[in-house]
Amino acid sequence: MGPVQQSVPKASIVIPSKNGGALLGVALQRIFGQSTPWPFEVIVVDSGSAAASLEILRGFPVRLHAVEPTAFNHGLTRDLGASLARGEHLVFLNQDVVPCDDRWLLTLLEPLEQGEEYAAVQGAIREFPDRPRFYWDSGGARFYFTRESERWIHGHGGIGFSTVNAAIRRAIWEACPFGDAVFMEDKKWQHAAAARGFRIAYQSDAAAFHTHNYDMPALVRRCQQEGFGWRLLGETYSCTDMLRDTLSPAKYGDLWRGLRAGHVRTVAEVLFPFIRPWLVFRGNRLCRRYPA
């Protein structure tokens, strides 16, 4: 059936955006090409896009809601989008995420449609096959090799909940919204949901493409933000953790193989296994404010 016209939507897809550009247009084209037996809607909460990106958004039947750039907050902005939604299920996507096929939405919501067992669903995240990408990837164990990430996933049923590609039952969100979160709104929500006994399903076939290609400043900022975000969640990354992760040998063999094959090309890619532990530690223990 596809995008909603007048009928009440089964799902509301919420996308925070700012200068999403051409890739957001590709994502929306794939979203509005979804094959579903029920209607859905797309809500974009935009925080200050330039005219070119706004023109792309207006080329699609999205419900566009604007907020001031200074008002953007990873948790509260998603809550705003959810509050505008009419669907039974809330789907959260980043603006640079493209569903892999036309059954992504239907597959993502299957666990929620089949009964009341699950409160939320985590979709799979894959790297774009045809875009430049950071050697260490950006959404898996090779990037998140440090112990705080391992501890979190181990303590939460093997899932690190991510609003890059996820769905939450609307009634559950109403009882457990994201709240104020400058970063890691998804992990904050996961922690609160687990405390209430809510379960999250993993749908490997509900996959979407998402790739980062970090330069050095972006990499430093990202890793420090993670450390700071863990601190806000009460997770400690100690000096001992940092030293053990720095000295762990497996990633250096991976680095050597990447260098020999010519896949490691940038300074950021060379330094990543050495500096990620320190940067996470710095964000977690030393930064007094969010490292923007």
Listing of model-derived features with the role each one plays in the protein:
Residues 68-85:
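Glycine-rich, basic loop-to-helix element that forms the pyrophosphate-binding segment
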Residues 183-191:
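Acidic donor-binding loop at a coil-to-helix junction in glycosyltransferase catalytic cores
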Residues 46-54, 97-98:
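A conserved acidic beta->alpha catalytic loop
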Residues 98-135:
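Conserved donor NDP-sugar-binding/catalytic core segment of glycosyltransferases
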Residues 123-124, 139-158:
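Short, flexible, basic/aromatic active-site loop/helix in glycosyltransferases
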Residues 90:
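Short aromatic/hydrophobic "clamp" motif used to bind/position activated sugar donors
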Residues 149-168, 182:
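A recurrent flexible, glycine/aromatic-enriched loop bordering the glycosyltransferase active site
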Residues 221-292:
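Non-catalytic, C-terminal membrane-associated alpha-helical segments of glycosyltransferases
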